[in-house]
Amino acid sequence: MMDYKKAGVDIEAGYKSVELMKEHVKKTMRAEVLGGLGGFSGAFSLAKIKEMEEPVLLSGTDGCGTKVKLAIIMDKHDTIGIDAVAMCVNDIACAGGEPLFFLDYIACGKNYPEKIADIVKGVAEGCLQSEAALIGGETAEHPGLMPEDEYDLAGFAVGVVDEKDIITGADVKAGDVLIGMASSGVHSNGFSLVRKIFEMTKESLDTYYDELGKTLGEALLAPTRIYVKALRSVKEAGVRIKACSHITGGGFYENVPRMLPEGKQAVIRKDSYEVPSIFKLMAKKGQVEEKMMYNTYNMGLGMVLAVDPADVDKTMEAIKAAGETPYVVGEIKDGEKGVTLC
């Protein structure tokens, strides 16, 4: 007799996954969360938002791209969730917002409860780092659509900001200083090229590189930095962030101009910080041109912000106090909207 399990969907495995992930999800709860895990929808009170003059909700949705494939190959699934959260909450923070809550979506060929719980463990860790509550999610088993061992991960975040505090870049002026925050490595973009490079050169993910201080796989799988606390620290120091860019897919050439008004150009000095060894290794092994690297990857800077020259010292101190590494990387000039790397 045919049943759902024989068709490829194991309901009992789904129940077990939920039980295993509960301990991780509970750690992310905030006072504003109403109800518990397992409801038809997640509920989050907005009562505290009344403290803002004109509260604006911000939303972000993203995934981890083909970095997920790397986690599958390495059979290490407890950090990829951090990437999913980071990709969403960093975008919200770029607009001056504070993340409120997060939801995840996992599509898999077969539900292996321990693996799903590991993925959610990473999601919960990302939520803890950004102080967002994990109020819901979905794990969808897709037999026949995906191989049993494969999965994809995406997320959705909601945050809030007072309208007067939204970072728009509108008042950026010539002379403003650009400050970059160090990345942990490749973060979550450009992994199709990463995999092609190392497939072509037949490099093993288990290969240890002295310049990396770890194996290739460990360096590539390093989770995306979450900059929410650092940007909050800057704001609490009394600094007005004029513009902010999350350096993701498209690298510097696509993302930096997004924070600029017309008639303003960002000039970034490549020698103002040390490019991480993983990027140098990728460029060398894959014979990738420098411009392509900067047009694809963060090259060591996961976030770039513009501040008034008088606020540079306070900004640097606030970022350091939040546990991130800042660099003064350039300045704003008059000129055609865009970015110049020199």
Predicted feature residues:
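Residue-level signature of catalytic and energy-coupling elements of molecular machines
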Residues: 10, 62, 175, 246, ...
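Hydrophobic face of alpha-helices
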Residues: 18, 117-120, 191
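N-terminal amphipathic/basic leader segments beginning at the initiator methionine
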Residues: 1-32
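Glycine-rich phosphate/pyrophosphate-binding loop regions near the starts of catalytic domains
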Residues: 23, 29-184
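Buried hydrophobic packing segments
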Residues: 17, 21, 43, 88-89, ...
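Residue-level detector of flexible, active-site-proximal loop/helix-junction positions
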Residues: 18, 50, 65, 141, ...
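Acidic, glycine-rich loop-and-beta core segments that form the ion-binding/anion-interacting portion
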Residues: 174-218
